[in-house]
Regions:
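Catalytic core of membrane glycerolipid acyltransferases/transacylases, capturing the structured
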Residues: 18, 31-90, 98, 151-152
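Residue-level preference for the first positions of well-ordered beta-strands
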Residues: 36-38, 106-112, 142
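A conditional alpha-helix N-cap/helix-loop micro-motif detector
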Residues: 89-92, 123
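Short, basic, glycine/proline-bearing loop/turn elements
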Residues: 12-13, 80-86, 113-117
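Helix-enriched interaction subdomains in cytosolic or periplasmic regions
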Residues: 1-9
Length: 159
């Protein structure tokens, strides 16, 4: 029952994303169809991760700061979408181990190199975790650029 409910919620959510943000996906052919890779988008809005996950045919797992999991609704969605909690400013091996396990299982992993929304616009240099994990796992990095305001009924481009 939970699996059915999860699929139903994902379908409804994807429909809402298409209706409200009219995403245009460019370069979908660059996404690996059956091998592991790290997907690295810029981070412009709180809905970035779910937009990318919803618009991709293959499931993408991601990491999020553990404070977000205090919100019961977010935790529910995180369980549906395969979002794992990590300590945001902790240099522990926990997030690296989780990431390597995801890649070892031949799955896609999404990491936001900025570490925060609009990080580069704020002058924050991208973090090197994605490169470290890619080099350790021997997996490619797929860059993704998100353009748009995420204002309702405006187009968002995922490139």
């Amino acid at each position: 029952m939970k699996k059915f409910l999860g699929l139903l919620i994902k379908k409804i959510y994807k429909g809402l994303m298409i209706l409200v943000y009219r995403p245009k996906v460019v370069g979908r052919e660059n996404m690996p169809k059956d091998t592991a890779a790290i997907v690295c988008p810029n981070h412009v809005h709180a809905l970035d991760s779910t937009l990318i996950i919803s618009m991709n045919k293959r499931h993408i797992k991601t990491l999020a700061k553990e404070e977000l999991f205090r919100n019961k609704f977010f935790k529910f969605l995180a369980d549906l979408y395969g979002i794992y909690p990590v300590k945001a400013n902790n240099k522990s091996m926990e997030s690296i181990k989780v990431s390597l396990k995801i890649l070892k299982n031949n799955e896609l992993l999404m990491i936001f190199p900025e570490g925060t929304r609009n990080g580069m616009a704020k002058g924050i240099k991208p973090k090197n975790g994605a490169v470290l994990i890619a080099a350790t796992a021997g997996k490619p990095i797929i860059p993704i650029g998100i353009q748009g305001s995420f204002k309702p009924f405006t187009k968002v481009i995922v490139n």
